[in-house]
Amino acid sequence: MRKGASNLNVSTAQRAAPMVSEAPIVMDCKLDKIFYGNFMAVRDSHVPIRKNEITGFIGPSGCGKSTVLRSLNRMNDLVKGFRFEGHVHFLGQDVYGKGVDPVVVRRYIGMVFQQPNPFSMSIFDNVAFGLRLNRYKGDLGDRVKHALQGAALWDEVKDKLKVSGLSLSGGQQQRLCIARAIATEPEVLLLDEPCSALDPIATRRVEELMVELKKDYTIALVTHNMQQAIRVADTTAFFSVDISQGTRTGYLVEMGPTAQIFQNPREQLTSDYISGKFS
């Protein structure tokens, strides 16, 4: 895992040109405008997501991090008044293109939410839920086991698969939700502050799991914890808020390798944020 940078605020003269990752872009996300009704939540944000990397989204509350994340697999379609201008290119196709089924999009771009949300059913059925929904024809037991192993949970629950997922601890519930997400073998995992409701020990387990999972998946992570971004993210995108005429619109300030963002940010606004001058 990444170690925290010792110098989080450097002068413009010290800033070096960022080293751009050579990993291929899995998702090219051009978010021109995102609306909820007449309210513009996000503007002018271009966010490339690279294969087998963790891309962290950081920024103050209300800057649109979660709105951006939920736009990547069309979860925001479920919100009344949502409107999207731009494109999200994934596997050679715009997920907002005409005729694209958002349910199919979410099959390939899975999501784990801030609060662990296991269903009121057994551990096994929680993991098998998406497989059954997608009419999986293979060995369900093997696939569930594989997903639980991938989420580093199998050894803890293998003897109680018929027990309710709600009986697990908070950290175990979040790993169960991750197992449920990876059971359908998505290409991309979207994690919306997955550790915010967890204690430090459970947080460490999930962070270790994220680093392990990126070997097989591409991950986008929203986090309020800058130290978490330093520890796990390969690339970090910093968002801020434009406040005008009583409204708050989020936008991307800069994006680059995590070490560069935290040690040598190009923008003064980024430097001010990571040094604690505003939050």
Swiss-Prot record:
It catalyses: phosphate(out) + ATP + H2O = ADP + 2 phosphate(in) + H(+). It is a peripheral membrane protein. Its EC number is 7.3.2.1. Its main location: membrane. Keywords: ATP-binding, Cell inner membrane, Cell membrane, Membrane, Nucleotide-binding, Phosphate transport, Translocase, Transport. Belongs to the ABC transporter superfamily. Phosphate importer (TC 3.A.1.7) family. This is Phosphate import ATP-binding protein PstB 1. It comes from Pseudomonas putida (strain ATCC 47054 / DSM 6125 / CFBP 8728 / NCIMB 11950 / KT2440).
